[in-house]
């Protein structure tokens, strides 16, 4: 595997978005992963609709939370997902618009072996990967720069996306895309320590990784 991967430098990652006061991190994580694999497969980087997932994915709970795999399944079953432009974000759950376009589709989704950071690294080398982390603690919330080493627990309360990895001064890290706007963290991103002692990964990052597949 390459020692350094950053999908942003390959133009495969959209600019940072902001979920605002809505518990829709799951939709932002899923959409970002889909945007990236679509760019990798087709060469087109299109901003897609988190709001469609919030309004239309009945397996999830809108602004009260959800899971990325349910979001991927919605996109598969629906035959695609609309663009951000056609179905813009409002940060509140509304009724599902019947006239929505199927602009980008996926074939399926794959779970990465749980609690295994080397399997996770292998997956991220091929495309950005959706993961869950515990983000409720003050140290995570107040992160600004450098490699975050905790402390944090492993409750799966926030969905984010790993868009790369590397090593700095002997410390391995993940490049993690958040959905709290560009003013949070390091321009919307957090570098999280990688290959920690716990198999769950820092803040539980290796507990539930998955990614969308596209032929």
UniProtKB/Swiss-Prot annotation:
Laticifer. One of its GO terms (biological process) is proteolysis. GO terms for cellular component: extracellular region. It is found in: Secreted. Disulfide bonds join 22-63, 56-96, 152-203. Keywords: Disulfide bond, Hydrolase, Protease, Secreted, Thiol protease. Active up to 62 degrees Celsius. Stable in 8 M urea and 2.5 M GuHCl at neutral pH, in 40% acetonitrile, 70% ethanol and 50% methanol. Unstable in SDS. Cysteine protease. This is Ervatamin-B. It comes from Tabernaemontana divaricata.
């Amino acid at each position: 595997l390459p020692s350094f991967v950053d999908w942003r430098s390959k133009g495969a990652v959209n600019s940072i978005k902001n979920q605002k006061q809505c518990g829709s991190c799951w939709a932002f994580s899923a959409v970002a992963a889909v945007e990236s694999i679509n760019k990798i497969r087709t060469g087109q980087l299109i901003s897609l609709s988190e709001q469609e997932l919030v309004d239309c994915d009945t397996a999830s709970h809108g602004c009260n939370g959800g899971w990325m795999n349910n979001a991927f399944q919605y996109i598969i079953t629906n035959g695609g997902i609309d663009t951000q432009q056609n179905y813009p974000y409002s940060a509140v759950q509304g009724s599902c618009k019947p006239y929505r376009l199927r602009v980008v589709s996926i074939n399926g989704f794959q779970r990465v072996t749980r609690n295994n950071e080397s399997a996770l690294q292998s997956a991220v080398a091929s495309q950005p990967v959706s993961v869950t982390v515990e983000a409720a603690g003050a140290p995570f919330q107040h992160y600004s720069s450098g490699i975050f080493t905790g402390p944090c627990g492993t409750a799966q309360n926030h969905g984010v996306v790993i868009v790369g990895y590397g090593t700095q001064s002997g410390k391995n890290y993940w490049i993690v895309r958040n959905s709290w706007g560009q003013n949070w963290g390091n321009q919307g991103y957090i570098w999280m320590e990688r290959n920690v002692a716990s198999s769950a990964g820092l803040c539980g990052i290796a507990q539930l990784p998955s990614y969308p597949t596209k032929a």
